[in-house]
């Protein structure tokens, strides 16, 4: 399998640009939920997808040293609300979201909050209709909504809330490789080299950005996001796994959490 023939998918958001810009072959760009489904069906060989996809279906290999993560406010994973977050009784979930929905459930449980959840396919520009109603937004939609409605809404930043209760970073997305792909290490090395090149030339990448202004991109890439997947990120993902099992968002797999962390490290290529 050549790199150009590889069936590769990537989330279609600003946060993924440093991880995919310059890939030599065709790339399927889509929302997290759609990419997870395509990868699970075997329609893709490799994809940058929600970290929750690995937690619920740990058949994949993980490209080591690369993730989309944060160790504080992430800016682009938010609950838009009016009034106090404790007063919200209904949250509309972004149908494109995977990891963020379950992160939200974990954080609400931590805060002892229990609003209803509804699914919506409405545009992000459609505002929550009343004070006790809120909406989960992710990716570029979240960025635009924050910038366009900064004076109308309050924003519960899920990265910031995670950092308040967990010392390790939160991992939103990982490169996952299907188990039948035989040259996973070669692919992983190429993706790591691409990430390194793009981050080393981040000013050039920002200068080519057409959807968001330079000042925002500089802060977003350098302050909000992290692109590593090392020991700290594995600890964060292990903590997320533990909390999802506790809330029965994931089935117990029979492994102790210490053993699971070792298995996670073993899956990296």
Regions found by a protein language model. Name each.
Residues 1-269:
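Domain-level signature for soluble enzymes in the chorismate/prephenate branch of the shikimate pathway
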């Amino acid at each position: 399998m050549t790199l150009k023939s590889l069936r590769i998918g990537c989330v279609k958001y600003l946060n993924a640009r440093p991880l995919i810009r310059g890939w030599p072959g065709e790339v399927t760009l889509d929302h997290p939920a759609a990419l997870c489904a395509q990868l699970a069906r075997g329609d893709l060989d490799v994809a940058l997808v929600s970290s929750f996809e690995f937690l619920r279906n740990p058949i994949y290999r993980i490209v080591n040293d690369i993730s989309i993560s944060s160790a504080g406010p992430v800016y682009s994973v938010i609950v838009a609300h009016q009034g106090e977050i404790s007063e919200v009784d209904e949250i509309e979930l972004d149908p494109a979201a995977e990891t963020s929905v379950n992160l939200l459930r974990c954080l609400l449980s931590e805060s002892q909050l229990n609003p209803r959840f509804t699914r919506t396919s409405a545009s992000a520009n459609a505002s929550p209709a009343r004070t006790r109603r809120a909406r989960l937004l992710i990716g570029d939609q979240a960025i635009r909504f924050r910038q366009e409605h900064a004076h109308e809404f309050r924003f519960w930043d899920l990265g910031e809330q995670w950092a308040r209760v967990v010392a390790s970073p939160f991992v939103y997305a990982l490169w996952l490789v299907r188990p039948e792909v035989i040259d996973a290490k070669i692919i992983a090395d190429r993706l790591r080299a691409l990430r390194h090149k793009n981050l080393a030339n981040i000013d050039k990448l920002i200068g080519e950005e057409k959807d968001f202004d330079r000042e925002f991109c500089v802060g977003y890439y350098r302050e909000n996001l992290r692109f590593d997947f090392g020991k700290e990120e594995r600890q964060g993902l292990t903590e997320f796994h533990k909390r999802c099992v506790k809330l029965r968002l994931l089935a117990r797999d029979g492994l102790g959490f210490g053993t699971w962390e070792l298995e996670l490290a073993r899956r990296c290529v």
